[in-house]
Swiss-Prot record:
GO cellular component terms, semicolon-separated: cytoplasm; DNA-directed RNA polymerase complex
UniProt record, GO biological process: DNA-templated transcription
Pfam families, per database record: RNA_pol_N (PF01194)
Protein name as annotated: DNA-directed RNA polymerase subunit Rpo10
Gene: rpo10
Length: 66
């Protein structure tokens, strides 16, 4: 839902890489090559970035209002 700040497994900071990763993948680059060029080689960190889904806008539609 919210961009992961750190890898869930090893704790490496990843939050600063996600906007770059997303922009380049949407521009048509292959995700694996983008991660390699960003220096993300551990499979746990790659998983964290590759599997992230932005659902925050969908979840906010169900926000309770007092």
């Amino acid at each position: 839902m919210i961009i992961p700040v750190r890898c869930f497994t090893c704790g490496r900071p990843l939050g600063h890489l996600y906007p770059i990763f997303k922009r380049r993948v949407l521009a048509g680059e292959r995700p694996g090559e983008v991660l390699d060029s960003l220096g993300v080689y551990r499979y746990c960190c790659r998983r964290t970035l590759l599997s992230h889904v932005e659902w925050i806008d969908d979840v906010l539609a169900y926000e309770r209002r007092s």
